[in-house]
């Protein structure tokens, strides 16, 4: 708790948290089932990676021996501050994104042409960028607007992850 590792509510996660982190991924995989467009797999991977990278980056980043910096102005802030980032945390985001991309590739995600290192790169990019958007929103809107809570931040993080993954997928 002292390092900010424990979640609010004693670590319990409610349905709003699950919705905020998972609804975009669920929508992408359902849409893929019906339409079969490979870019929906990229969106799914980016969305899922964004939620996972955000959590891993935040939790692992809090273990850093150096103070994190606020994403908006790069000033040192205490661990656990909304919008704080660290090299350790950002490195964890890249590593987790790569792991998720590798798992998707080796598990044989259902695609004809989208696989291999492209799949890994799209997953890493979506996860990293989505988590970065989460940090920015945490430092700005989440801390200044009562109506804009963590679940909204998570929801927009996963949308950003999906969008950034689609953009890279389209460019490859």
Task: Name each model feature, range by range.
Residues 1-168:
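Interhelical loop and helix-boundary elements at the membrane-water interface
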Residues 170-172:
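Alpha-helical transmembrane segments and their cytosolic interface
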């Amino acid at each position: 708790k002292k390092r900010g590792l424990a979640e609010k509510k004693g670590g319990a996660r409610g349905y709003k948290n699950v919705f905020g982190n998972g609804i975009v991924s669920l929508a992408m995989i359902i849409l893929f089932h019906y339409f079969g467009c490979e870019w929906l797999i990229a969106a799914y991977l980016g969305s899922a990676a964004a939620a996972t990278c955000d959590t891993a980056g935040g939790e692992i980043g809090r273990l850093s021996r150096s103070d994190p910096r606020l994403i908006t102005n790069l000033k040192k802030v205490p661990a656990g501050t909304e919008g704080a980032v660290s090299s350790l945390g950002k490195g964890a985001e890249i590593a987790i994104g790569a792991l998720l991309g590798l798992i998707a590739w080796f598990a044989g995600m259902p695609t004809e042409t989208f696989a291999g290192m492209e799949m890994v790169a799209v997953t890493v990019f979506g996860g990293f960028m989505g988590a970065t958007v989460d940090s920015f929103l945490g430092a700005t809107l989440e801390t200044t607007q009562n109506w804009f809570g963590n679940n909204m931040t998570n929801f927009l993080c996963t949308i950003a992850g999906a969008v950034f993954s689609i953009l890279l997928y389209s460019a490859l």
